[in-house]
């Protein structure tokens, strides 16, 4: 995501709602299968829509400096800000005062699919907030320092997103083996060991063949891809054999 666009503020404004929408889809999966995370899914839907409206405001109001910004009209920006305030505040007020959803008691352990998807949601939300903060910080700094300007460049975003991307990829490979409610530890650990050995051998082969061409980021990308692919294939073959 940060390759060709160099973490442009306008592109970040589109990236943040995408991250929140991905978290929402995973949260709805838990809500559909286990009837939990209901309130959290509702909040995520409000926040994802709010981030979309906020991105529209940032792009069209002219307060962001970007070659990708367009329709720089302050009056139009105020109109979009009014729409943003009306729908987002209205949605939050309705959620707070009209929410009659009762908490549903449901057991799930730390090695369950529910907990894995909860971690997924937390990581995606923290990542979205971190990117939004880096995008808006120059505006906040300028507002509180009498017009002094500062820029937040690619080093900040790469420092933030790289560990999150690696962690999300690793957790995605592990989450493939998790079951609803609880997972049998011995079966889970056994499959994970087989996958880890396979990926380790594949990593050695890639290092031997492409050592001069692979930079660290590309290597980790290939590693995570192979990790998820191996888990998917093992799960697919286990279903077919069953």
Regions found by a protein language model. Give the residues of each.
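Contiguous transmembrane helix-bundle modules in multi-pass membrane proteins
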Residues: 9-16, 66-242
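Hydrophobic, small-residue-rich alpha-helical packing segments that form membrane-like cores
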Residues: 1-59, 65-68, 72-84
């Amino acid at each position: 995501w940060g390759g060709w666009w160099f973490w442009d503020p306008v592109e970040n404004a589109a990236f943040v709602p995408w991250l929140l929408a991905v978290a929402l889809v995973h949260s709805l999966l838990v809500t559909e299968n286990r009837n939990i995370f209901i309130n959290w899914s509702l909040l995520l839907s409000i926040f994802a829509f709010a981030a979309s409206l906020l991105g529209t405001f940032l792009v069209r109001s002219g307060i962001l400096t970007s070659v990708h910004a367009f329709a720089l009209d302050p009056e139009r920006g105020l109109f979009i800000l009014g729409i943003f305030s009306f729908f987002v505040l209205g949605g939050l007020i309705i959620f707070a005062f009209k929410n009659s959803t009762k908490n549903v008691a449901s057991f799930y352990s730390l090695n369950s699919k529910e907990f894995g998807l909860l971690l997924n949601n937390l990581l995606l939300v923290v990542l979205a907030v971190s990117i939004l903060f880096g995008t808006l910080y120059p505006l906040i700094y300028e507002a509180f320092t009498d017009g002094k300007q500062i820029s937040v460049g690619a080093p900040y975003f790469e420092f933030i997103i790289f560990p999150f991307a690696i962690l999300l990829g690793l957790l995605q490979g592990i989450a493939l083996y998790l079951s609803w409610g609880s997972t049998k530890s011995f079966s889970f650990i056994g499959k994970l060991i087989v996958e880890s050995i396979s990926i380790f051998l594949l990593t050695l082969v890639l290092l031997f063949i492409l050592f001069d061409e692979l930079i660290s980021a590309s290597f980790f990308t290939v590693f995570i891809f192979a990790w998820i692919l191996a888990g998917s294939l093992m799960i697919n073959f286990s279903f077919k054999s069953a």
